[in-house]
Amino acid sequence: MPTAAVFNIEGQQVGEIELSEAVFGQPVNDAVLHEVVVMQLANRRQGTHDTKTRSEVRGGGRKPWRQKGTGRARHGTIRSPIWRGGGIVFGPHPRDYSYRVPKKVKRLALKSALATKVDAGRILVLDALELPGPKTKEMARILANLKAGEGALVVTAERNVNVEKSARNLPGVKSLEARQLNVYDLLNHPHLIITRDAVARVEEVLA
């Protein structure tokens, strides 16, 4: 059964916690991780890109010169795709890129992402994380104490506004509540800092 050290906000180890084998001890499945990350990034796309075809570009209603007798190539409009300023052929138009993968695949990917942090020794469990107010300096100090200053995903059991506001101005740091935990953010941050309560919440949902 995998284990993780438990720290206080001063960076001192105060114990050890046993992690669920069914959640944190699964083999890493790279193919599933890739599938879910691609889906998440696709779902973030706005899809508002647009180009104009020859029928949408302004102008070009008049034939530029007569069909025969000039010695020049025949043209019917200055908005043809082969003209500068003409329409675009097969260009992008607004579309919805979002799609879904099966729920079981998402759960498996989340377990794999958690396993990568356990295998790399990059999971730090906090006994508690309470801040008196939104203080970026205090959050930076806590991360420095935990030797996670280069970037971390901070996960709490419930939404913690003080933690959220304290973390959002720090580069490479993001705060989530347990129910928002996702594959992309886990893989995109070097460290996972998670409270003991959040571990229980994640295990309850994924076990």
Curated annotation (Swiss-Prot):
InterPro entries given in the database record: Ribosomal_uL4, Ribosomal_uL4-like, Ribosomal_uL4_dom_sf
Q: Name one GO molecular function term.
A: rRNA binding
Compositional bias ranges of the Basic and acidic residues kind: 47-59
Taken from the record, one Pfam family name reads Ribosomal_L4
**Region span, Disordered:** 44-77
Q: Which domain of life is it from?
A: Bacteria
Keywords of the record, alphabetical order, are: Ribonucleoprotein, Ribosomal protein, RNA-binding, rRNA-binding
Write out the GO biological process terms.
translation
Instruction: Please give the GO cellular component terms listed in this UniProt entry.
Output: ribonucleoprotein complex; ribosome
UniProt cross-references to PANTHER family, sorted A to Z: 50S RIBOSOMAL PROTEIN L4, LARGE RIBOSOMAL SUBUNIT PROTEIN UL4M
User: Partners and quaternary state?
Assistant: Part of the 50S ribosomal subunit.
| Role | One of the primary rRNA binding proteins, this protein initially binds near the 5'-end of the 23S rRNA. It is important during the early stages of 50S assembly. It makes multiple contacts with different domains of the 23S rRNA in the assembled 50S subunit and ribosome.
Q: What's this protein's name?
A: Large ribosomal subunit protein uL4
Which gene specifies this protein's sequence? rplD
